[in-house]
Amino acid sequence: MDSNVNSQRQRADSGYHRPVLLEQTLEALQIRPDGVYLDGTAGGGGHSYAIASRLRGGRLIALDQDPDAIRAAGERLAGLPATVVQSNFTHMDGVLQQLGIAAVDGILLDIGVSSHQLDAPERGFSYHYDAPLDMRMSQSGTTAADLVATLSEQQLADIFRRYGEEKFARPIARSIVRQRDKQSIQTTLQLAELVSQSVPAAARRDGHPARRVFQALRIAVNGELDCLSAALDTAFDCLKPGGRLAIITFHSLEDAMVKERFAQWRQGCICPREFPVCVCGRTPAAHPVLKKPATATPEELRDNPRSRSAKLRCVEKCHDRYRD
């Protein structure tokens, strides 16, 4: 392992969370010392620190909607050529405009909840701790407890099925509605135990039975898939020609969305097959940097089990995307 990357990993790991696929991400983005880069999901600054450390005359813009993450990132990036801004990555174009930056050389989005958020009981993301059922990344707006208390059985089942791919969505939703008529569901352990009681015993042997339900509620509370869909085109538009967009996902719904959008940008001619020559004149707006998604090495899997489901995809912009 490169000693520079190793030292960056050690610094990036300290005190907040361990950035996943760090080496693969840096290699995919091909950081130029004088380049301008944007980390749309700074978290505690793990990836951001590694990027900013490579800049000489360049600049990093680090965004996150979580005020806790912004404080941690600000401390970690102090003294480096980095600007830290509290904002959802869907607004990256507006942030860049306010900073007087027309386009950037590379963008990183590390989608999903951070290890710090999972490990902070009071944030209510984890079924391992007894805490308020919150799950808000921005610490404002509707909580998971609000959804559990107000949505109908059908609405809850739809969320569990769509965002968690939970095959026992209906019985779980039914149990929630019945339970809340007796007592409000306010904590993570209340919900986790209720889910566990709602699925067959065989389903409890394949990981924690509440995992998919918690994932689904988190996605719904934060509008994660809607945000990602909107951010993909915005991010591509913010790149210079030759700029690169790297995205790390942690579950199949996110990865499928990224894969599909990348494929759209890579599509060239759209003429019917029976046409002998191209008349549309379209050429690919992007080309793949990685032939297949990068995943964690055995070493990283040993050191950081949470990297198991991480996938990195990256494309390079050739020209502006087609908008029809």
What are these regions (language model features)?
Residues M1-D324:
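S-adenosyl-L-methionine-dependent methyltransferase catalytic core, i.e., the SAM/SAH-binding region
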